[in-house]
């Protein structure tokens, strides 16, 4: 059975299983070797990262980035904006403002006759009833 080789650590793993590979990848020695590997490419680009960012790994899906210290937008310390002002990412686009419709509750009472195309009961000869009787015969 082929053994697993780690390019970063330049070694073969002693336990070739998924659990063994995961444990190796979580180890401090492997993480340090990965950090050193990528630092050789970032050295000429001026990218500055502290060791904590490398060792923490990627952020879990759906998590928020860390908040900067100090007040933002004139709000309370900790980054909360003042009341009534949406957060930066939630600001509406510039332009005419359309307000959402206000819900006023259910209508009170039946609608008036003739309102909104409604009519009274059908008259003689209208669809839905028997034909009108003629005075001249059957």
UniProtKB/Swiss-Prot annotation:
<keyword id="KW-0694">RNA-binding</keyword>
<dbReference type="InterPro" id="IPR013085">
    <property type="entry name" value="U1-CZ_Znf_C2H2"/>
</dbReference>
<dbReference type="GO" id="GO:0000387">
    <property type="term" value="P:spliceosomal snRNP assembly"/>
</dbReference>
<dbReference type="Pfam" id="PF06220">
    <property type="entry name" value="zf-U1"/>
</dbReference>
<dbReference type="InterPro" id="IPR003604">
    <property type="entry name" value="Matrin/U1-like-C_Znf_C2H2"/>
</dbReference>
<dbReference type="InterPro" id="IPR036236">
    <property type="entry name" value="Znf_C2H2_sf"/>
</dbReference>
<dbReference type="InterPro" id="IPR017340">
    <property type="entry name" value="U1_snRNP-C"/>
</dbReference>
<comment type="similarity">
    <text>Belongs to the U1 small nuclear ribonucleoprotein C family.</text>
</comment>
<keyword id="KW-0687">Ribonucleoprotein</keyword>
<dbReference type="GO" id="GO:0030627">
    <property type="term" value="F:pre-mRNA 5'-splice site binding"/>
</dbReference>
<dbReference type="GO" id="GO:0030619">
    <property type="term" value="F:U1 snRNA binding"/>
</dbReference>
<feature type="zinc finger region" description="Matrin-type">
    <location>
        <begin position="4"/>
        <end position="36"/>
    </location>
</feature>
<keyword id="KW-0863">Zinc-finger</keyword>
<keyword id="KW-0479">Metal-binding</keyword>
<keyword id="KW-0539">Nucleus</keyword>
<dbReference type="GO" id="GO:0008270">
    <property type="term" value="F:zinc ion binding"/>
</dbReference>
<dbReference type="GO" id="GO:0003729">
    <property type="term" value="F:mRNA binding"/>
</dbReference>
<dbReference type="GO" id="GO:0000395">
    <property type="term" value="P:mRNA 5'-splice site recognition"/>
</dbReference>
<comment type="function">
    <text>Component of the spliceosomal U1 snRNP, which is essential for recognition of the pre-mRNA 5' splice-site and the subsequent assembly of the spliceosome. U1-C is directly involved in initial 5' splice-site recognition for both constitutive and regulated alternative splicing. The interaction with the 5' splice-site seems to precede base-pairing between the pre-mRNA and the U1 snRNA. Stimulates commitment or early (E) complex formation by stabilizing the base pairing of the 5' end of the U1 snRNA and the 5' splice-site region.</text>
</comment>
<protein>
    <recommendedName>
        <fullName>U1 small nuclear ribonucleoprotein C</fullName>
    </recommendedName>
</protein>
<dbReference type="InterPro" id="IPR000690">
    <property type="entry name" value="Matrin/U1-C_Znf_C2H2"/>
</dbReference>
<feature type="compositionally biased region" description="Pro residues">
    <location>
        <begin position="79"/>
        <end position="113"/>
    </location>
</feature>
<feature type="compositionally biased region" description="Pro residues">
    <location>
        <begin position="121"/>
        <end position="138"/>
    </location>
</feature>
<dbReference type="GO" id="GO:0000243">
    <property type="term" value="C:commitment complex"/>
</dbReference>
<comment type="subunit">
    <text>U1 snRNP is composed of the 7 core Sm proteins B/B', D1, D2, D3, E, F and G that assemble in a heptameric protein ring on the Sm site of the small nuclear RNA to form the core snRNP, and at least 3 U1 snRNP-specific proteins U1-70K, U1-A and U1-C. U1-C interacts with U1 snRNA and the 5' splice-site region of the pre-mRNA.</text>
</comment>
<dbReference type="GO" id="GO:0005685">
    <property type="term" value="C:U1 snRNP"/>
</dbReference>
<keyword id="KW-0862">Zinc</keyword>
<feature type="region of interest" description="Disordered">
    <location>
        <begin position="59"/>
        <end position="138"/>
    </location>
</feature>
<dbReference type="GO" id="GO:0071004">
    <property type="term" value="C:U2-type prespliceosome"/>
</dbReference>
